[in-house]
Structure formats: C-alpha cells, structure tokens
C-alpha cells in the first residue's frame, strides 16, 4: 500500500529543520472560487506565506494520494471544473484515496492532515460552522453543522481565518466554539470578524497584537497546558464590505437555495457565488484580499512559533 500522505520535499525539509510551514486548504480552488480567481487565490496565498518567511504547503488529494505541498500542476488539476474534483472533509479522505480521486480539502480535512504532518499553522478564508435556517425552515429540524468545528476541537493547529463564513449563524458558531473548548483570538480586534465584514457584534475575550503574542498563547495552550484543541486566530478582512449589504444578499440567497432544494456540501459555494453576484463582485474582491491577508498573518505566526521553539 502506498503511503497515504506525501510531503513535498521542501515541506519535508522545513519540518525536519523545525522551520516555519503554513498549511493551505484547496477547496477554495476546487469549489470555492470560479476560474481564474481560484488559481489566482492559491498563488497569492502561497506568495504571501513565502513573503512572511515561511514555506507554503497546499493540502490536496491528487490521484488518490494526500499531498502536503501540492505543486502548480496539482492545483491546475483541481481548478479544472471538467475534472469534477471532489470536496473532501476529514471523513472523506480515506474513501477518496481508495478510489484514486482528486479533491480539494476543506478546513476540517486540511486541519486533520496538517496535524498529522506536524504543521501547526494553517491559513484559510473562513471556517465553517452552524448554518442559518432559511426563511420558513422549522427550528426543530436537524441543524446543519460543519465538520470544521469538530476538527478544530481535536486537531492542534492554529487556524488563521477571517472568522466564520458570513453565510453562517455567527452567534451559534461562536457558542459552539466555546462549548468545544476552542480558543478564539482576535488579531488586533476585540470583535469577531464576519468574513466579508470587519465586525459581527460578537465580542471576543482575547486578542493579540502581533505574531509573537499569538505564538506565546499557542505554546502555552499546547505545550505548557497540554491542550489538544486547535486555536482560531480571527483576522479582520482588509477590504471589508458593509455588513448590511452582505446580510441583504445572504437573506436573498438563502431563500433561493431553499427553493432550489440545495443542501449539504453544495450550500456554501452556492451562497458565496450568489453573494458575489448580489454585491457586484465586491464580495469576491474582499474574499481574495482576506485570503491573502490571512496567509500573510499565518506566515508571521509560523515564523514566530518556530523561533519560539528554537
């Protein structure tokens, strides 16, 4: 049986030397953004990590192998809609490998693989969480909760994001993170970012002002206190869209999704694309900017964490 996880040589060497490495998810390439924005986002994120002094490690399933440090050819495979790449959460990895499939990795899958590989910092756009109820949907129905939350509770990885995706129930997601014991740190903010928008109205108890402060928290959490949960580092988006504009677009998109019977893994990309159309591309521009910003911050944190361990 071939090894299910393959590390690119640059990633392997950096980890062996105790150097800074940042994992990057690839569902944004396979499903999250349309061409050519998907590849642009991946390349900008990798460049931002390198500019911060760390090694980027895009995680993907390529021809049945979990690759840590996917190269440009692999990313181009995932970016091609004609190849119909799957969307891999953590639970899907074994089955997709067995079937020899290609897949972009979600936050849950990327965090799981990063932890397995020994990578402690991971950059993404926004995490999944508790989905909103569509208008008219009964509250007593089964809640749609992303596996990202459960994986954050068991993978000791710092996930750098612009908070939960704006299409979610942010208050319920924040409560779930608290229940699961996942610390949430605001990056120079005391308010949970709302992905496209810099404020959600949800206060954060803890904030850090720089990468060194974040690294100290991570070391204490994992090493001194022996905690196993991940840590969410929430970074406000650099090109924020007014919250009321985003909320109006989400409300309309939720009704449309319900009318079309769109559920499960298809909901998030559908809603994100609908919000982008409704905001005349402003949301997509904000998405690209925050992805790059998060990758840069993650690179800084990885460098500080590696220096702290030296």
UniProtKB/Swiss-Prot annotation:
It comes from the Bacteria. Its EC number is 4.2.1.70. Keywords: Glycosidase, Hydrolase, Lyase, Manganese, Metal-binding. Its cofactor is Mn(2+). InterPro entries: Indigdn_synthA-like, PsuG. One of its GO terms (cellular component) is cytoplasm. Substrate binds at residues 87, 107, 146-148. Binds 1 Mn(2+) ion per subunit. One of its GO terms (biological process) is nucleobase catabolic process. GO terms for molecular function: hydrolase activity, acting on glycosyl bonds; metal ion binding; pseudouridylate synthase activity. Mn(2+) binds at residue 144. It holds the Pfam family Indigoidine_A. Disulfide bonds: none annotated. The active site is at residues 25, 165. It is an enzyme of class 4 (lyase). It catalyses: D-ribose 5-phosphate + uracil = psi-UMP + H2O. Catalyzes the reversible cleavage of pseudouridine 5'-phosphate (PsiMP) to ribose 5-phosphate and uracil. Functions biologically in the cleavage direction, as part of a pseudouridine degradation pathway. Homotrimer. Belongs to the pseudouridine-5'-phosphate glycosidase family. This is Pseudouridine-5'-phosphate glycosidase. It comes from Anaeromyxobacter dehalogenans (strain 2CP-1 / ATCC BAA-258).
């Amino acid at each position: 049986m071939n090894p299910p996880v393959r590390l690119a040589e640059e990633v392997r060497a950096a980890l062996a030397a105790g150097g800074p490495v940042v994992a990057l998810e690839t569902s944004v390439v396979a499903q999250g953004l349309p061409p050519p924005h998907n590849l642009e986002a991946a390349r900008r994120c990798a460049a931002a990590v390198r500019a911060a002094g760390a090694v980027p490690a895009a995680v993907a399933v390529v021809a049945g192998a979990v690759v840590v440090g996917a190269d440009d050819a692999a990313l181009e495979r995932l970016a091609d809609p004609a190849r119909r790449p799957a969307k891999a959460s953590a639970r899907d990895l074994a089955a997709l490998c067995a079937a020899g499939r290609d897949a972009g990795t979600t936050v849950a899958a990327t965090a799981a693989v990063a932890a397995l590989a020994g990578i402690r910092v991971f950059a993404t756009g926004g995490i999944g969480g508790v989905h909103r109820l569509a208008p008219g949907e009964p509250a007593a129905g089964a809640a749609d909760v992303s596996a990202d939350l459960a994986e954050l509770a068991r993978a000791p990885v710092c996930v750098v994001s612009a908070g939960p995706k704006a299409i979610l129930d942010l208050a319920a997601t924040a409560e779930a993170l608290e229940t699961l014991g996942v610390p949430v740190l605001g990056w120079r903010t005391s308010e949970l970012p709302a992905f496209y928008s810099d404020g959600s109205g949800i206060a954060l108890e803890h904030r850090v002002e720089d990468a060194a402060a974040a690294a100290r928290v991570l070391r204490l959490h994992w090493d001194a206190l022996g905690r196993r949960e991940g840590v969410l580092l929430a970074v406000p988006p650099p090109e924020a869209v007014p919250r009321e504009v985003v909320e109006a677009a989400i409300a309309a998109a939720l009704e449309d999704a319900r009318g079309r019977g769109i559920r499960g893994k298809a909901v998030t990309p559908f809603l994100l694309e609908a919000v982008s159309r409704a905001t005349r591309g402003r949301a997509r521009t904000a998405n690209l900017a925050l992805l790059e910003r998060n990758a840069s911050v993650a690179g800084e944190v990885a460098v500080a964490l590696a220096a702290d361990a030296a």
